[in-house]
């Protein structure tokens, strides 16, 4: 009889548990400023390039259109983004940051850095760099997105 796997001793198990813990921390931290954790990633994309099409945001974040639509509705409700139809394609919409959405960036960055510091407390600078590299490789494996050295 084959020996049963000890899930708790696998990298996948640890990664899943750390991801869950981080996600919960992200929700708490961003909730303090009225955001849900996933919405932050939409804002990150718009800070890189404002006026993206909704479908492009979904593609960049590897999320479904309904999921992005729900996130955008929440961001519109709290006046961080607006949605505009394209003149040349009535089926397509572009998403733009509002003034408030642009102004919130600094505050959100502060919250993010605090979250990151809490997450990495206890790791040396070298361990942080190694972790960053390894997570970049895992991201590349799952999404085809280049890792930190490939950008």
Where are these regions (language model features)?
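Charged, amphipathic alpha-helical coiled-coil/dimerization segments
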Residues: 23, 73-136, 140-143
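Short, locally clustered residues in the helix-turn-helix/winged-helix DNA-binding domain
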Residues: 19, 44-48, 109, 136
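Key DNA-contact positions within bacterial/archaeal DNA-binding proteins
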Residues: 40, 66
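N-terminal leader segment of winged-helix/HTH proteins
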Residues: 1-33, 151
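Pre-recognition alpha-helix immediately N-terminal to the DNA-recognition helix
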Residues: 14, 25, 41-44, 103, ...
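Central "turn" residue of the DNA-binding helix-turn-helix
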Residues: 50-51, 62, 124
């Amino acid at each position: 009889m084959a020996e049963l796997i000890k899930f708790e001793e696998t990298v996948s198990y640890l990664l899943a548990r750390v991801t869950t813990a981080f996600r919960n921390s992200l929700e708490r931290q961003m909730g303090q400023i009225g955001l849900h954790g996933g919405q932050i990633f939409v804002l990150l994309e718009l800070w890189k390039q404002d006026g993206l099409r909704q479908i492009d945001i979904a593609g960049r974040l590897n999320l479904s259109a309904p999921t992005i639509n729900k996130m955008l509705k929440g961001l519109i409700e709290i006046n961080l983004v607006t949605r505009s139809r394209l003149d040349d394609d009535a089926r397509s919409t572009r998403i733009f940051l509002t003034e408030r959405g642009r102004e919130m960036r600094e505050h959100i960055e502060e919250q993010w850095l605090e979250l990151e510091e809490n997450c990495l407390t206890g790791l040396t600078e070298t361990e942080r760099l190694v972790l960053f590299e390894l997570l970049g490789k895992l991201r590349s494996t799952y999404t085809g997105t280049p890792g930190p050295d490939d950008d």
